[in-house]
Every structure is written in structure tokens, then in C-alpha cells.
Amino acid sequence: MHQQVIIFDTTLRDGEQSLQTSLSVKEKLQIAFALEKLGVDVMEVGFPISSPGDFESVHTIAQNIQNSCVCGLARCLEKDIDIAAEALKSAKKFRIHIFLPTSAIHIQSKLRKNFDQIIDMTTHSIRYARKYTDDVEFSCEDAGRTSIDNLCRIVEIAIKSGARTINIPDTVGYTIPNQFSEIIYSLYKKVPIIDQAIISVHCHDDLGMAVGNSISAIQAGARQIEGTINGIGERAGNTALEEIIMAIKIRHDLLHVYTNIHHHEIYQTSQVVSQLCNMPIPANKAIVGSNAFSHSSGIHQDGVLKNKKNYEIMNPKNIGLKKVQLNLTSRSGRAAVKYHMEKMGYQEHDYNIDELYKVFLKLADQKGRVFNYELEALAFTKYSQEYLEYFALESFHIHSTSSALSNAIINLYCGKEKKIHSCSTTGRGPIDAAYKALTLISKLPIKLEKYQLHSKKYEYNILGQVNIIVSYQGRHFHGIGSNIDIIKASIIAMIQALNNIWQTKQITINHKNTQHIKK
């Protein structure tokens, strides 16, 4: 019979400690709501005694969360426990999580105590916390470097004192999977009352072992996994919960456990955490990276088109993604080109695949990735500057005021004759104003879907590179602009996107006319 693994999220406590700036109460609450929607069993949302701001955020989240258990961290000190209980008292379900170092190096060099004193502090603190709640978790800080005899001794004392959950952290990410699983096995062998508590693990990623150690702990009997969304956290980060959750789901045949997580919320939760914490997700990040369900190799693309299971061990819909991405690059084969043309509504008799594939490879070698509208242009036009630059920047002027409103005057060359069209608009900031003016001049009702700004050093200046995605009539179009002036780079990117849209419109018109003539 499969057993449940409790998912303990510490994004708002351990994860937040790694951020360059603290989250506001409002931002923390937004993340907490996302975690609750995801279905985490326990969310550790702060260290109440550490600051008035942390107390307020824990208190606010405790008042608003309905389903998940809300947890606060405390040292083995009465004052810490009192403050944590005060912050948590309005929660429907709450847990007090207390911790104490157990490794020789921490006890001697950090606390200047002996192990017997640690035992006494553990007993007293757990019993004291039990005055406020039956749900007390005790963590053996630096358990990964604690002697097994001492670890077994303190775990037994903690359970006898009333701790319902015993956490075994690999605080400095020192252990490797077979070593860490042996620690958990040893606890089950040597602590007679181990079945009276849930064994939890909290692994750090200093050697890249956090997820591996957590999985090995599950196999050894751990039934709570602590971690963070996207693996954010101190130093190299924590166990990435999305990876644990999907490993349990996909490899249930070996792990024989389950979680109560709503898997289809994983991607959205990851995005919320990334955006609010201002921590971009690496493209190759497992489960939630932009390349996680993307295929560029021609062999892989052909295999996926024939049967997704050839190269995909999970369905992207399981995490809330709608589709697999087959990127068009110089490594793509004819099958991928046909697939993208079919997605745009074209049949094989509409174009010559051999001719299209030749010019596609030339363009892919030049620019790396080719987008659908560029492929469409290759199929039905000579991919010339005439088509690429229907719109071109003549000049612009931006005037901003202290009220956060900005006025933009944009002058564009339009059409083959390069007639200048002008527009003046007001917006909330210079880029908003400029984009409104460009939309009015082009008469293309577009919506800005994504705006990314990257900086690069160029000679003695910092060059701003702007990447945008806009939507028009249900399709996405891209634009890139580079300049030492960020506003100009943004305008260049938008003009490129407008040119791509204009070109696609011309191709559609020409194709319809051709089809009409054939009939």
C-alpha cells in the first residue's frame, strides 16, 4: 500500500533568506496563496522573532490561509517560541518548528556547549512548545555531520518530549545519497519509538545532491520532504519541490508513495515565485525550465512527432503547460518544418518542402532560432529587406514628468515610399507611451505579452538588449532591439515585431489570392 509523503514548503522562510531584498507582506501573501492552491501540506512562512516585518508577514498569512498548515520557525528559546505562537495563533492549523545544532562542530564552535546540554535544551523546548500546539517539529541542525549515536539519542529524546515530526537536515549539503539514506535507515533500526513520529528531511544543494538525497531518504522511510519552489535558498539552494513532486508521480513504480499536490498548478506556482522573488528560472531547469519540454534536435523532433513517449517521460499538461515546444533551429529536420507549417494551416501541396527546407537551413544558420512567421515568409516570399522593414524609425522624443506620466512623439518611415507618419501619445512611463504611439501609427492592435531587458558590456558602454513578445490575432510575434539607450532599444524591438506582423499579413493575403485564382 502506497503511503503519503508530506510536502513541507519553506520558500517563504529558507528560500527568502537568499534574496537580495526582502519580500513585502503583500508579496509573501501572494506566494502563500499560490502554495495553498498547489496543495502543499505545510508552509513555513517565516522566523517571527527575527524582525517585526517577519512577525507581521507570518501573522498575516496565518489569518488568511485556509487549508495548509502554517508553520513558524523558532530557536530552542522560550522567547522565540512565545513570539512564534503569537504570530501563528489565528491560523486554522499551525506548527511550531524548533531547531538546535547536533553536530560536534556546531555544538562546540557555535554554541560553546556539550551534548548533554543540547539534550536538556531539546527536552525543555519541545515541552514548552507543546503548551501552544500538539504539532511541534524538531530539527537536528547539521544532522548530516552528526555522529549516528548522538543523532539516535537526540531523536529518541525529542520524540519522548512530544515532537510529532523529526527533521533530519543536510544543512551544508555535505552528504551523498547512499550515505544519507543510511542515516535514515539507522534511525529506524536504532530508535525504538521511531514510529511515533514522522521522519522529515531538509537537504541543501551545495554538491548538487539535494533532490537525490531526498529521494534516497524516501526510499529509506522518510515521509516528509522539505524544500522550496524552484530550489531557491541559502547558498546553492534547497531541494526543488517541483522535482521531488514529479519524481514521486512519475516513478511511483519504484518509490511506492504519493503526494496530495495539485500537479497542474506546478508551473504557475513556479512562475509566481520566480517573478516575485526576481529570480529567473534557468532554461535547462528540470520540470519548469523553458527548455524542459522543448526539442531542437531533428532526430528528437521526428521521434516526438511520431510518439511523444519516445523522448518525453511526462506530459507537460501534468504541470500546467499546454504544449510541447519544437524549436526550429539548424538541427531541425523536415518533419519539424512540416509540423510547424501544418500548425499554421498549410498543407504540403501549398509549398515545396525541399526548397523551403534549403532556405530554412540558411536562415537558421544565420540567426539560430527561426519563428513560425519567418518560416511562413520563407515558404511564400523572398525573405528580403523590403518585407522585413515596412516600418523603420525616423526619430523619437520622450518627455517624462514627476507624475510618472510620459509623452512620446514617434516618427516612422512607412511603406516602400518611406513616408513619415507621426504620433504623439501619453502613457504610464516612457516605454508604455512609445508603444501606444507605435500601435496607433501601425494600426495594428497588439498586446505586449512579455518584456525582457538584458544588459551587456559593449566597449566602454552598457548595451541594453530588449526582447519582447506581442500577440496579434491569436499569434505571437517577437522583436529584439539593442542600444545603449534602453528606450530606443525598446522601440527598435517593437518595430521589429510590427514588421513581422505586417509581413505575415501580406503573406496571408497573397496566399488567399493564389488559392482564389487556382479555384
Swiss-Prot record:
Enzyme class: transferase
The protein's Enzyme Commission number: 2.3.3.13
Residues annotated as binding Mn(2+): D14, H202, H204, N238
Cofactor(s) required for function per UniProt: Mn(2+)
Function field: Catalyzes the condensation of the acetyl group of acetyl-CoA with 3-methyl-2-oxobutanoate (2-ketoisovalerate) to form 3-carboxy-3-hydroxy-4-methylpentanoate (2-isopropylmalate).
Subunit and interaction comment: Homodimer.
HAMAP family linked to this entry: LeuA_type1 (MF_01025)
Protein name: 2-isopropylmalate synthase
Organism of origin: Blochmanniella floridana
